[in-house]
Amino acid sequence: MNQHSTSDKIPKTKRGRKTREKLLHAAEAEFGERGFPEASIASITQRAGVALGTFYVYFESKEEIFRALVSHMGELTRQWIGERVAESPDRLTAERRGVEAFIEFVRSNRNLYRVVSMAQFVAEDAFREYYSVFASAYEENLRRAAEAGEIREGDCEVWSWALIGMTVFLGMRFADWDEERSVEEIAAATSELVSKGMAKNA
């Protein structure tokens, strides 16, 4: 199987794109609830309400739709966060809003962690790409903020991965596991850590 052939099958018609979206949405539920080994193409098509043969118009295999789903969820997450931080007056405000947005997204899309975590073992390259795309854009945003004098200069590559790691685990604890803390409270505590650090006299 050509692991990178999914893009060749992206439909050009509105109807085709809608059907593909239905399949991806169904796959998210199927993989999230049953895991990759137990998930089946038949169940995905049943959830999507399409014929089994329709699946192969868009995807070659279960692995291919899984890979497409990981990429799709990354795009949705970045779009969701991007829209909510776009009007931020400075980088530190964007960091706080980004945490809020990510936790809100996970609370509304609980299969996110399950699917992305599975990718590490099912399709490691897709797993790496998922986070690498995030980190690359994050690093560039931090560099621009440093150039604009909004934050101090530093190792933006390391910072981007550190901030992503922090946010991912915040999402796991306060969105996937439970919702006992408010989004605003979590983001405020995170923002204080990012802006002031942990030093006593910071």
Where are these regions (language model features)?
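Helix-turn-helix
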Residues: K22, E30-E64, A68
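Amphipathic alpha-helical packing segments from all-alpha helical-bundle domains
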Residues: E75-R78, E124-A148, E157-W161, F169
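Short coil/turn segments at alpha/beta junctions that flank glycine-rich nucleotide-binding fingerprints
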Residues: E33-P37, S88, N109, A148
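Short helix-capping/turn signature of helix-turn-helix
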Residues: F59, M118-V122
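Hydrophobic alpha-helical connector segments
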Residues: A68, Q79-S108, W159-L163, E184-A187
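C-terminal peripheral helix-coil segments that are non-catalytic and often amphipathic
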Residues: M1-I10, E104-S108, S136-E147, M166, ...
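Generic hydrophobic, amphipathic alpha-helix propensity
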Residues: T19-E28, I44, I65, L69-T77, ...
